[in-house]
Every structure is written in C-alpha cells, then in structure tokens.
Amino acid sequence: MLAQVPIRPLRIAFDDIKTEEAYTKALKMSVKHGIKDFSNYLLYNFKEQPIDLYHRMRINVDLCEELNVSIYSFPMKYHPIRDEHSHDRDYIGKHWNRKYIRAVQAILNATKGKIGRGVSFFEKAFGRNEDEFMELLIM
C-alpha cells in the first residue's frame, strides 16, 4: 500500500548508527514493496563520532548496490535550537572540531551536497575505509 502513495523519493533519516538494524530493515521492507528511490538525511556534529557518519554513508552506498535502488544521502550539520548556540552556526559537537566540519563541508561542496550511487565515486570522495576518511578530515 505504501508503494502506491505517490511519494518519490521516499524520505527517510539515518541519524544514529545505533539504529542501523531498524533502518536497514525499514529500507529493505520498502524496497520489497516496490519503492526504489530514497532521499536520506544524515545528521552529523551531534553526539556521534565522525567515523559514525562515514559508516552511515557507506551503508547507504552499499545498500544501493545490494538492492539496486537509489538512495541520495544528504548529510546535515546539527545546530541546537535551544541554549547559547541557537542563534549562530558555531556549535561544535563533543566529538567534532572545526577542522572536521570544514572538511566534511568541503567534500559535500564537491559532491553538490549529496551522496548517491556508486562505490568508486564514494570512495574517491570519502575514502575507502575509516582510516582514509579520518585522513581526509585532518588534511
């Protein structure tokens, strides 16, 4: 029934690596019922480690290949809506620093803000593994 609703792409979020099992289950269930196009938001600079962002992006790229679907991921930088940083863009998450955030933003500028299909493109932009991703962040 969900696949009959004229929503293209289906919008879904993957904000925490701890939800990987539920996220992949929901995605696979959607594909099973005929949905092939997804728009995916990935929160970063919140409570997670930078490497968690890499894992969530990698999971989406791998799922595109495995399921033969399109998942366009849009990493979104977290900004508090309350407290001292609610009116500026200077918030830095506990496990992040300004250099990491700028590196992610620079890569996203080159990819026009999204990550789509294609393992080779992803690996050139974000690295083939955690170590290469972290090297990109500290460059």
Where are these regions (language model features)?
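Conserved AdoMet/S-adenosylmethionine-binding subsite of the radical SAM
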Residues: 1-86
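Flexible glycine/acidic-rich beta-alpha junction loops that bind and position SAM and/or redox cofactors
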Residues: 44-51, 67-134
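Long C-terminal interaction/binding lobes of large macromolecular proteins
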Residues: 138-139
